[in-house]
């Protein structure tokens, strides 16, 4: 793979431009300042095209907050904006006792030159679209972040907190610009440094099968419901309000919820309302169609689909890895007489069935075939890591293989882990203040594990 440490604008001494910073404004318990920066689309060509990157600064109402150091939040995904600071609670409440928190909309998301089909078609043909999207992985997310740090905190490294894919970004940050980091906290997101997309899915499918077993053990009545629903959708032209056809495979994608606490119950209660009586026949209910559509975030968060496998690619093509593993080793997932849910998985057929993705199909195939992806981690730099990194690793995490996480943690100095089966992938949201406090203590040596 092409090396990660390619020259960027920052290494050339070229500063980015802060376009705007709002006046402080308040919501209950919080003061917010919105910042927008202009950064190079390609950090290797700082004089070329620019995009915007948005960061929301969040402080408590203590007048001394402006003197607190920064904590940069790296969001999960890929393809999601930073959390919206609605109220002072959970991990944010703990963070604000000693930090100014920066909610960072990574490039392509939220208010940071968001990628959607309406914008992407303006890039030109499928090749131009794919070339544009190649710039939206974690390496450039990190380059943006470090350039912003050089502007907002030029003399002081900052701390980071990474949720899920935010941990991928953290490990890339430690590879590219460790000098910008004081300490890092990772929740359910330590990647295997050398693991390919294919290896990821070979490890994921057994977890998903087990979650299916647990689900149908808890809700045995749902097997018959799902088989009935799948047959109905195969035999009838059922449509979402936006005109997309409702197919059984989209129902299978509800299994994404298995990776979060208490969300299997949400699936069960949604299935209760799958049908409604219309005269002398049953039809799929509007309630179910709207619930299913709301659960599938691919239409509003297309990066989650189009770059999902690319976050593992380093010098090789992702090649629709999940689809290949499913067809070769788990063909029974296609048998609707024995209905099984998928997990966090992306398939090429989605680009035929989901409106917002249809126009990205050619670009998605180009990206899946692309084998020139540069490296995302520098194992030599990581082998000499001096930045304290504290991680929460969830033993039963359906999204991030704990065995792969352990491989990385054991190979990188100054990484400490709290291994637990108490939380699912959403531990930061559920464990909040308590779990973040535990990782702070772990990272700073107050506790051993």
Task: Tell what function each PLM region has.
Residues 1-8:
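Eukaryotic N-terminal low-complexity, Ser/Thr- and Lys/Arg-rich leader segments
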Residues 10-242, 349, 356-364, 374-382, ...:
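Gly/Pro-rich cap/lid or specificity-loop segments adjacent to the active site
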Residues 55, 394, 408:
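Hydrophobic, well-ordered secondary-structure elements that form the walls
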Residues 237-370:
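Alpha/beta-hydrolase fold active-site neighborhood
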Residues 270-272, 401-408:
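Short alpha-helix in the alpha/beta-hydrolase fold that links the catalytic acid
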Residues 274, 412-415:
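Alpha-helix boundary/capping residues
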Residues 390-396:
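Conserved strand-to-loop "acid loop" that flanks and positions the catalytic carboxylate
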Residues 391, 409-413:
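C-terminal structured domains
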């Amino acid at each position: 793979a092409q090396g990660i440490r390619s020259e960027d604008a920052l290494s050339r001494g070229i500063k980015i431009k802060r376009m705007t910073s709002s006046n402080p404004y308040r919501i209950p318990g919080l003061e917010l300042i919105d910042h927008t920066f202009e950064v190079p689309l390609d950090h290797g060509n700082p004089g070329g095209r620019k995009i915007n990157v948005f960061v929301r600064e969040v402080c408590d109402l203590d007048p001394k907050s402006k003197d607190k150091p920064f904590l940069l939040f790296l969001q999960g995904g890929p393809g999601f904006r930073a959390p919206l600071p609605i109220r002072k609670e959970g991990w944010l409440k703990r963070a604000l006792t000693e930090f100014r928190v920066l909610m960072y909309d990574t490039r392509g998301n939220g208010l940071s030159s968001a990628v959607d089909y309406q914008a992407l078609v303006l890039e030109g043909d499928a090749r131009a679209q794919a070339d544009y999207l190649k710039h939206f992985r974690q390496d450039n997310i990190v380059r943006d972040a470090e350039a912003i740090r050089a502007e907002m905190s030029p003399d002081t490294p900052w701390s980071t907190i990474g949720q899920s894919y935010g941990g991928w970004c953290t490990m890339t940050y430690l590879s590219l610009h460790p000098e910008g980091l004081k300490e890092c906290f990772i929740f359910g997101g330590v990647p295997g440094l050398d693991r390919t997309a294919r290896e990821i899915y070979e490890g994921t499918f057994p977890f998903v099968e087990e979650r299916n077993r647990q689900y149908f053990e808890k809700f045995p009545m749902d097997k018959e419901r799902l088989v009935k629903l799948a047959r109905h959708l195969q035999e009838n032209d059922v449509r979402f309000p936006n005109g997309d056809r409702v197919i059984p495979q989209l129902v299978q994608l509800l299994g994404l919820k298995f990776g979060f606490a208490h969300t299997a119950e949400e699936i069960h209660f949604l299935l209760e309302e799958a049908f409604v009586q219309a005269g002398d026949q049953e039809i799929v209910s509007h309630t179910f169609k709207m619930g299913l559509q709301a659960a599938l975030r691919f239409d509003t968060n297309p990066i989650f689909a189009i770059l999902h496998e690319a976050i593992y690619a380093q010098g090789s093509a992702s090649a629709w890895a999940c689809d290949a593993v499913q067809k070769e080793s788990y063909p029974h997932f296609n048998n609707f007489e024995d209905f099984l849910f998928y997990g966090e998985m992306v398939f090429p057929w989605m680009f035929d069935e989901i409106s917002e993705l249809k126009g990205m199909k050619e670009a998605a195939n180009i990206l899946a075939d692309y084998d020139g992806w540069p490296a995302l981690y520098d194992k030599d730099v990581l082998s000499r890591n001096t930045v304290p990194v504290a991680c929460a690793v969830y033993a039963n995490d359906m999204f991030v293989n704990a065995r792969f996480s352990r491989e990385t943690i054991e190979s990188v100095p100054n990484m400490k882990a709290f291994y637990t089966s108490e939380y699912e992938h959403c531990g930061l949201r559920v464990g909040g203040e308590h779990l973040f406090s535990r990782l702070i203590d772990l990272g700073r040596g107050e506790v051993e594990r």
